[in-house]
Every structure is written in structure tokens, then in C-alpha cells.
Amino acid sequence: MEYAAIVLAAGQGKRMKAGMNKQLIDLNGIPLIVHSLRLFEEDAACKAIWLVVSETERQTMEKLVAEYQIGKVKGLVNGGAERQDSVYAGLKGMEEAEIVLIHDGARPFVAKPILTKLADEAAQSGAAIAAVPVKDTVKLADKNSVARTVERKNLWAAQTPQAFQYELVLAAHEDAKKHGFLGTDDASLVERLDKRVTIVESDYLNIKLTTEEDLLFAETILKKRENQL
């Protein structure tokens, strides 16, 4: 199923403590955001990429897109104060598509079959997310004490991309905006409309680079892939 992608690169990533937007951090000689953009550039089903950026870094991002020849980027959109604002800006700024995949630019290791499954599932059901079963035991806390242990077998850790029929996710964002609801991902906005969100099982390599330790893990993944070539 053909789709368009919104890639989010407007956040500053303060937990990375890099003193710069983590999207620009060098990862094996290439900026992190370029690794993520190439996921979609190299997928034949992706017909357009809309890159959401910080206004102050717009020129830098434009140069990277040109330098690394990411030809599917059809436009750059200025992000907002919150992630949700940035996604909404991307939805409003893009050319309408039947299916849209929304992806965090700090996740450079999505497997191509996941992109295909997400787009196909969204076309069928309206909404689909990449996710993995939770491996750790999860405790519900009351301040510094354990209130109870949560049953793990039904818990999934949501990732991106998250795929939607365009009209559905736009309506979900507009409803959330109208009612002042701030969600932690786009699927949560669709859930508010009592719409079904399908899970597409992903893998544990699809990490979001958030801390300095994540960078070490990412470099290990890249080196392993190079050795397999």
C-alpha cells in the first residue's frame, strides 16, 4: 500500500545532553535524522516525506536533505511547542494522502517489512501502530512504594511509525485540540474517538535514541549490520 510519511525532527532531545538537537548527532558518520529519512527514501511504497523541523534549524535540515539526496522530501514544516502540535502541523502542511505514517526521527532502525505491514493494516482498519511485548515486570507505584504488579501478558510498548488513514488521524488531532487533550502518541488521540487501533508486532531494535546510552547501542547495531554486508 502506498503512503506518505511525516518524520518528526523538531524536538531538542534534552535527555541526550548533547548540547544540540539529537537529530543532528553524528551516527557512524551520518546525522541521525538522515538514517531515519533513508528508511522511507528507500521504501518504494513511500511516495512523499514531510519533515517537521524546528524553525531555527530549518536551513540546516534543508542542507542535509539536499546533501544526502533525500528526494522524496516534498516539504519542510515548522513544528510546535509539543510533539502533538508538530504532528498536527505536519498533517495540515502536507499534501493529502490516503495513508500516512507518522515517525519519530530518532528511531533509525525500523525494519522495512514493518513499514509495509503498517501501511497495509491502516488501509484495512484505519489505524495501526508498531509495538513490542513488554519484557520487564511492570509495577504500579504510589509515590515510592509498589501499589501493585501489572499483568504483563497484555502489555505492549508502543513505537513508531504509527499508520493511519489521513482523514481519521486529522479528525483525531482536531478533536484533541478542540478539547485540550494532550496525548503521548497519535494512537491515543484516535482511541479517544472509540476507533480500533491494530498492533503490528515490531522488534526490539526499533529503539528511540533518547539518552547517551542509546547512542552506544545504536553504534553497535550499525557495526553489526556493516559486518553482515
Swiss-Prot record:
Give site residues, Positions MEP for the nucleophilic attack. Answer: R152, K208
Q: Which domain of life is it from?
A: Bacteria
The biological pathway it contributes to is: Isoprenoid biosynthesis; isopentenyl diphosphate biosynthesis via DXP pathway; isopentenyl diphosphate from 1-deoxy-D-xylulose 5-phosphate: step 2/6
Q: Which GO terms describe its molecular function?
A: 2-C-methyl-D-erythritol 4-phosphate cytidylyltransferase activity
The main enzyme category here is transferase
Key words of the record? Isoprene biosynthesis, Nucleotidyltransferase, Transferase
Q: What does this protein do?
A: Catalyzes the formation of 4-diphosphocytidyl-2-C-methyl-D-erythritol from CTP and 2-C-methyl-D-erythritol 4-phosphate (MEP).
Spell out the PANTHER family in the cross-references: 2-C-METHYL-D-ERYTHRITOL 4-PHOSPHATE CYTIDYLYLTRANSFERASE, CHLOROPLASTIC (PTHR32125:SF4)
What is the designated name of this protein? 2-C-methyl-D-erythritol 4-phosphate cytidylyltransferase
Lineage start: Bacteria, Bacillati, Bacillota, Bacilli, Bacillales
